[in-house]
Structures are given as C-alpha cells and as structure tokens.
Amino acid sequence: MNPAHLLVLLAVCVSLLGASTIPPLPLNLVQFSNMIKCTIPGSRPLLDYADYGCYCGAGGSGTPVDELDRCCQTHDNCYSQAKKHPACKSPLDSPYIKIYSYTCSGGSLTCRDDNDECGAFICNCDRTAAICFAGAPYNKENYNIDTKKHCK
C-alpha cells in the first residue's frame, strides 16, 4: 500500500478516536474475531456476538444476562484497563486499533512474545475473552434483546 494512503488511514483512525460523542469501532475486530474462530471453529463472531446480551457489541450496561454476556463484560473491563495501562499511552495503543501477534494451534491461543507490553496486555484481553466464549453456552433468546428493558 502506498505510504500516503497509510498516513490518510492513520489520520482517519486517530480522528475517530478523538470524537468524544461517537464511540470508536474496534478496528482490531478482525483479530478478535479470528481468536474466537480459533476457540470455536465454525462460529460467526461478527454476526453472533455483535448484539448479544447487555455487553456483547458496542457499549454495555446493567447486569449481564448470562455467562456469555459476563465474558463480554469482562472483556469490556479489560479494554478499560488497557486504556489506563502505563504502556498504552499512545493513541496508537488504543485497544480498538492496536495490532498484536498471536498464534492459533488446535484451538489453543498463544499471545506471542514479540508483542510490546501494551500489545501483550490487549492480546491477553482478547485471548481470555475468546476462551471464555468457548466455555459459555450461546442462548439465542439473548441475541438482539431490548437492552432498555433487560440491562438495568
């Protein structure tokens, strides 16, 4: 890719992070999605988990509706910790855009040693959540729920 295009893309990403009224979309969603596919082969993370319970997807509030939703709440909390982590001070270290390296082998995830401290922290947030998802039942009745009613 042309370096000028990369700079424009980076500028757009940084400006999105600075927009206080618009929550940033996780730009490393592909990595997290692939981690989930590693622990749950055949799953469709972007479809199945983007609007599940009170915490899976954008935002989150109230009491989690089940074990899977608690996995998402824990993941949200981990990202909040990452934003405050001393090694994650740069806007480029946001958990929503930070790229890290990991391996998937036989359903087992490993965050690689070549990650910097911030990347390792965020990788472990995603790894822990993917493992949690794999151990939690998926209840279809908790997909696309009325969050105003169920997430108080």
From Swiss-Prot:
Residues given in the record as Ca(2+) binding sites: Y55, G57, G59, D76
Species this protein is from: Laticauda semifasciata
Active site (record annotation): H75, D126
Disulfide links within the chain: C38-C104, C54-C151, C56-C72, C71-C132, C78-C125, C88-C118, C111-C123
PANTHER family listed in its UniProt record: PHOSPHOLIPASE A2, PHOSPHOLIPASE A2 FAMILY MEMBER
Cofactor: Ca(2+)
Designated name of the protein: Phospholipase A2 GL16-1
CC annotations in GO: extracellular region
Lineage, broadest ranks: Eukaryota, Metazoa, Chordata, Craniata, Vertebrata
Cofactor notes: Binds 1 Ca(2+) ion per subunit.
Family: Belongs to the phospholipase A2 family. Group I subfamily.
Secretion signal, residue range per the UniProt entry: 1-21
